[in-house]
Structure formats: C-alpha cells, structure tokens
From Swiss-Prot:
It comes from Cucumis melo var. cantalupensis. Residues 158-307 form the GAF domain. The gene is ETR1. This is Ethylene receptor 1. Residues 350-588 form the Histidine kinase domain. It is an enzyme of class 2 (transferase). The modification 4-aspartylphosphate is found at residue 662. It catalyses: ATP + protein L-histidine = ADP + protein N-phospho-L-histidine.
C-alpha cells in the first residue's frame, strides 16, 4: 500500500456506494410505481385494448419490483428480522408474478405479432383502396368527359359538324397539339386528310391505305401509340421543336348501311374504317395515360354511331326530297288527269245533250208514226227506225254511265222497291224481242224471295236487262230462262274470288240471278274479255257484233252493289250461263207502305188521252219544241210554246196545269226560272206542275231540280208512251193533292 498513489475519497468507499444504491433504489422504486399508474391511465382511455388482465400482471410485477427496491433501502444497514422477512416475502411474490408474466408472454407475443401483421395488411388494403379510389375518380373523370363529348357529338346530325366538333372537343379535353381525321377515298385504296384541328381546309394530303402503321391500327379496336414520324402524323411544324409529343391513332368504323348510299362516302360493301390521329404537345414530358386512351376509344365508337345516324338522316332527307319531287309530279299528273276527266265529262255532257236533242225528234216522231195507219212495209220501217234509235239512246246512256263509273262519280240511289215487279218489268221489256226471234222465255222466282227490297232499283234492272239482253242477242233459237233466288251460304263456298267476301246478316240478303240460254256459247279463253269495253270475241255469228258496253257496265254495277258476276260456257254452240250475286237490304213494313203507286198508274194509262189539258212548253231549240208539242197535241193537250225566257214568263198563267221546260235555255238559269215561277204563284194549288225536259242525265242535274222544287224530270229522247206515262202520273198526283 506504500507505493499506491490512489486519492482518498472524501467519504469512505462503502458509504459512497451505499449512498448511490440508496438514490438508485429510490428512483427505481419511483419509476416502478409510476409505470403502473401510467398503464392504468392509458387503459382507461383506450376502450378497445384486448389485454387488460395482462396489464394487471405487468402492473403487479412492476409494483412488486418497486417494493423490492424500496425495502432494499433498509437492508444496507443493520436491520431487524422483520425487515428481512418483508424483503424475502416481496422477492418471493416478485418471483412468482414475474414467472407468471413470463409464461403469459409466450401466448401474448404471437398475438401482438399478428396484430402487427394485420396492421401491415390493413395498410396494404388502405393503399389498394386509395389506388381503386383514384381509378374510380379517373373513370368518373373519363366518364364525364365521354358524356360531355358524346353530348357535343350528338347535338347535331350533320356529319361534317359531328367530325369537326369531335376534333375540337378532343383537343380541348386532352390538351392536344393537333388532331386529324383521315377518311378513305371512294376507291378504298387511299386515306385522305379530311378534317384537322387547326387547318380549315386540309386538301391534297393522301396516304396509301396499305401502310404497315395503318394496317396495324385497323386490325385492332384499341387506341395504339404510333411513331411521330409516321406519314399520318406529319402534320405539325417541326421548327424549334426538340422532342415531338406522343401520338396515338384509333380506327373509326364506318358502319355498313345496306339501304343507303351517300354520294361522297366510300363504297361500304366491305368493312371500312376512318383513321383518327391525336398528338400531344411537343417539348413536353407528358405521356398518354390509360384512361385517356380509353376515352379516345369510346369517343371513336360514339363518332361511328353518330356518323351512321347522320348518314341515315341524310339519306332520309334525300329520300324525302325525292318523294316531294315525285309527289309534285304526281300532283301535277293528278291535276292533268282531273283536267282531262273534266274535259272528257264536259265533252260527254255536251255530246249527250246535243245527241239527245235530235234523238228526241227521231224517237218522238217515230212513236207518233206508229200510232197512225201504216202499211205493213211502212210499219216495219218505222219500227226499225224506233228500235235503232232506242238502241242508240241506250248506247249513249251506257257511255255516260261507264264514264261516271270510271271516275267514281256514279253512286247508288238507295230506296225501297218491289223486287218481283222489277223482274216482271224486265220480262215485259224483253218478251217482244223473244217473240220476234221465236225464243222461249221463262222466269222463276224463288219461294223465299222477298217481295220488297232496299237498293237501287234502276241499276239492278239495268244489270238484269244487260245480262238478259246479251243472252237474247246471241241466241238464234232455243230458250232463255231467268231465275232469282236468295243466295245461301253453301253458294258462297262455291265462289272463291279474292275481292268478294259476303257476310250474312239480319239486315240484308244476297240476291242470286242466273240467266241460261241455248245460244252460240263462248270460247273459254274469251270469257275474261266479255267484261271489257267493246269486246270483240268469237261469240255467235260475225254479224252479231261485240258485246258492247253492256257486260262491262253490268260488272261495275254489280261491284257497286257489293256483288260478283261470272259467266260459264262449255264452248261454242253450247249455250252460256250468266250468274251474278248482289247485296240488297231487307225492307220493313213502314217502308213498304210508302211505295208509290207507279205500277197502277202505268196499268191504267196505256191508252189514255188528256183532252183540254193546258200545257206550256219552253225550249230554245225549235225542233225539240215542235216535237214535244206534237207529242202533247197527239195526247189531246192544248199546248202553248215559248222559245225564250221573256216569252215564257209573259204567257205562263194559272190556266196552265203542266209546264215543260229545258233548263239549258240561254239567258237565265233554269233553276232560277223555277224559283221565279214558285214566287209568282203564291198559292200552291195555283202553281202549274214544273217538269224538266233535258238531255243532261247526271246526278247533279237531278239533285238541283229537286232543290229548286221541280215536280219531275224527263230525259230526252221521249216517246209517246213515255209522255203519256208522265202526264198520267202528274194528273194522279194532282187528284191526290186536291182530295187530301
């Protein structure tokens, strides 16, 4: 120890160490006691911490450790046995708690590690969700741009505006330096620059369609990046540019329109595409992003649809213009046809009036001659003249009827009539001819055939007369039979005609008329010709002539009455059967009671004269006036004539019982004249009967006469029998009027 140079401390070494141990144990105990307090505080603040009981163990362990260090302060000096026992107890408890805590950590540490793993997993999930949210936001942004671009593209149906709007909106949305659209030429061998973003009229730029870059783009439905030096991308100036921006190209399908053809579009027999090229700004680090490429692809599809709609609209407008031109041409043709029809009708009306006037003279004078004493040869000549005149008058009527049937102006005059009387009247008219030709004529009316019917009596009689007259015309010998029955449903099944569909009902019935003859027959190939105008067939002898207008008019009358007509013949020389079915209404009792007594009048007036009956005749045609006067004088009438309106108004008086007037008299309207006569004779029984004697057979004339208050209408020509019948009916009405 003599050679040791150690410095003696101020306090002894044992005391210094003890002091440090005192201080250390105190602070260790303080720390141990504060840590459980902090744990208790944070556990109370945390509502989701799952290991509360573990913290209790840690707290107990730490408190015991602190208590051990605190008790240890009294063990450095002399201490009692109690302190040693307390110290030992604390250390034992600390050992037990620390071992239990250590054992529990074996189970807790894996859970804590899994918590860390879950934390990392959640962080990864959060990062993935952030990426998905970013993608969703990008998609929403892309969708918004697509909707905006689609709205702009669909705002018009002009294809030039569509394409220009597409380039402008894409350039604005994607901040493009240039955007161009290359369209295929009509030959399909080249692409022509049609629209650009900055050039107004890009013309003269064409590239072959078989370039590799074009083939690559056309073979894919995606937007592809292409070289900025590609021929389809060489549109922007390169002066002062160091790095060209990225370029993408996408195909635009030109949809196939099989029913349309646009003049300046390529032939679309094969699948064709246009090419849209989009260029990013030069000298920038910007690159195409995925959502931008998707936007370009969607816009290309929308442009294709919009172009197809525009093409359809253009063709529709072109078709509309063509249709309007055709309508104008059709309207012009219709007006020309109507003008021609009016001219024809006017011509026929004039010819009708002018032909009936001389026919009136011929028939009237011939009928007067018939009632005089003539030699057989003279009577035969007069009868021949009268028959020929009646035939000519019938032909005139047929021509007018056919004209009105063809232009649709002829309508049925529906009324209640005696159906049996119609057939008896036909029999009476045809019988004289059959007697001359020595033909047997029979009539059979079905037991269920109603006596009265509703329909057009005149047209039905005309149809029957035409068919029967045709049978008489082509029969030199043998017989003719007429049968009329109510058509049954079984009969309808035998008739298979496309435009004839009879419908049974309680309000109407179908009349079936059949005329059989043993005449010259008809060749089967000639049957369809018989219903045409002035048909010439091999029917009968050559001097019999054609079928004229009779069957043609008859067919049209039958069609008007919702019926059907057909002919049957086994061949030449084997006769013929003509059958037609027409629709007639069923008459009720009230309509039957209102039927006129025409048949009675005709029966009682066959040889009646009218001595002393004062009649006034007004006609501007001297021949017609004289002929009418001759007929009336022959019937015993006292006749006064007038050749002008002034003369007529001057001589007409209450003494005149009947007035015959021609409504076509020049100087004043005949209808106006009738009104003036009605005004002149205030009392109805003082006014003479007013009868129109005219050559106009149209329906308008008849309706005008009824409106003007005329009492009758007679069509020229007029025979003596017809005049006698008219006067008898007028006198019968006057008697009925005076006795009522």
């Amino acid at each position: 120890m003599e050679n040791c140079y150690c410095i003696e401390p101020q306090w002894p070494a044992d005391e210094l160490l003890m002091k440090y141990q005192y201080i250390s144990d105190f602070f260790i105990a303080l720390a141990y006691f504060s840590i459980p307090l902090e744990l208790i505080y944070f556990v109370k603040k945390s509502a989701v911490f799952p290991y509360r009981w573990v913290l209790v163990q840690f707290g107990a362990f730490i408190v015991l450790c602190g208590a051990t260090h605190l008790i240890n302060l009294w063990t450095f000096t002399m201490h009692s046995r109690t302190v040693a026992v307390v110290m030992t107890t604390a250390k034992v408890l600390t050992a037990v708690v620390s071992c239990a805590t250590a054992l529990m950590l074996v189970h807790i540490i894996p859970d804590l590690l899994s918590v860390k793993t879950r934390e990392l997993f959640l962080k990864n999930k959060a990062a993935e969700l952030d990426r998905e949210m970013g993608l969703i936001r990008t998609q929403e942004e892309t969708g918004r741009h697509v909707r905006m671009l689609t709205h702009e593209i669909r705002s018009t149906l002009d294809r030039h505006t569509i394409l220009k709007t597409t380039l402008v909106e894409l350039g604005r949305t994607l901040a493009l330096e240039e955007c161009a659209l290359w369209m295929p030429t009509r030959t399909g061998l080249e692409l022509q620059l049609s629209y650009t973003l900055h050039q107004q009229n890009p013309v003269g730029y064409t590239v072959p369609i078989n370039l590799p870059v074009i083939s690559q783009v056309f073979s894919s439905n995606r937007a592809l990046k292409i070289s900025p030096n590609s021929p389809v991308a060489s549109l922007r100036p390169r002066a002062g540019r160091y790095v060209a921006g990225e370029v993408v190209a996408v195909r635009v399908p030109l949809l196939h329109l099989s029913n349309f053809q646009i003049n300046d579009w390529p032939e679309l027999s094969t699948k064709r595409y246009a090419l849209m090229v989009l260029m990013l700004p030069s000298d920038s680090a910007r690159q195409w992003r995925v959502h931008e490429l998707e936007l370009v692809e969607v816009v290309a599809d929308q442009v294709a649809v919009a172009l197809s709609h525009a093409a359809i609209l253009e063709e529709s407008m072109r078709a509309r213009d063509l249709l309007m031109e055709q309508n104008v041409a059709l309207d012009l043709a219709r007006r020309e046809a109507e003008t021609a029809i009016r001219a024809r009708n006017d011509f026929l009306a004039v010819m009708n009036h002018e032909m009936r006037t001389p026919m009136h003279a011929i028939i009237a004078l011939s009928s007067l001659l018939q009632e005089t004493e003539l030699t057989p040869e003279q009577r035969l000549m007069v009868e021949t003249i009268l028959k020929s005149s009646n035939l000519l008058a019938t032909l005139i009527n047929d021509v007018l009827d056919l004209s009105r049937l063809e232009d649709g102006s002829l309508q049925l005059d529906i009324g209640t009539f005696n159906l049996h009387a119609v057939f008896k009247e036909v029999l009476n008219l045809i019988k004289p001819v059959t007697l001359v030709k020595k033909l047997s004529l029979t009539l059979h009316l079905g037991p269920d055939l109603p006596v009265f019917a509703v329909g057009d009596e005149k047209r039905l009689m005309q149809a029957i007369l035409n068919v029967v007259g045709n049978a008489v015309k082509f029969s030199k010998e043998g017989s003719i039979s007429i049968s009329a029955i109510v058509a049954k449903s079984e009969t309808f099944r035998e008739i298979r005609v496309p435009d004839f569909h009879p419908v049974p009902s309680d309000s109407h019935f179908y009349l079936r008329v059949q005329v059989k003859d043993t005449g010259s027959g008809i060749s089967p190939q000639d049957i369809p010709k018989l219903f045409t105008k002035f048909a010439q067939t091999t029917v009968g002898p050559r001097n019999s002539g054609g079928s004229g207008l009779g069957l043609a008019i008859c067919k049209r009358f039958v069609n008007l009455m919702e019926g059907h007509i057909w002919l049957e013949s086994e061949g030449l020389g084997k006769g013929c059967t003509a059958t037609f079915i027409v629709k007639l209404g069923i008459a009720d009792q009230s309509n039957e009671s209102k039927l006129p007594y025409t048949s009675k009048i005709h029966e009682n007036s066959i040889h009646t004269s009218f001595p002393g009956l004062k009649v006034l005749v007004m006609d501007d045609n001297g021949v017609s006036r004289s002929v009418t006067k001759g007929l009336l004088v022959h019937l015993g009438c006292e006749v006064t004539t007038a050749g002008s309106i002034e003369e007529f108004l001057r001589v007409v008086s209450q003494e005149h019982k009947v007035v015959f007037m021609d409504i076509c008299t020049p100087g004043v309207d005949g209808y106006e004249l009738a009104i003036r006569i009605r005004e002149k004779f205030a009392k109805c029984h003082e006014r003479p009967f007013m009868v129109v004697l005219t050559g106009n057979s149209d329906k308008v004339t008849k309706e005008s006469c009824l409106r003007a208050g005329m009492d009758g209408l007679i069509l020229k020509p007029v025979s003596i029998d017809k005049m006698r019948s008219v006067l008898s009916e007028l006198i019968e009405r006057r008697v009925l009027f005076e006795t009522s």
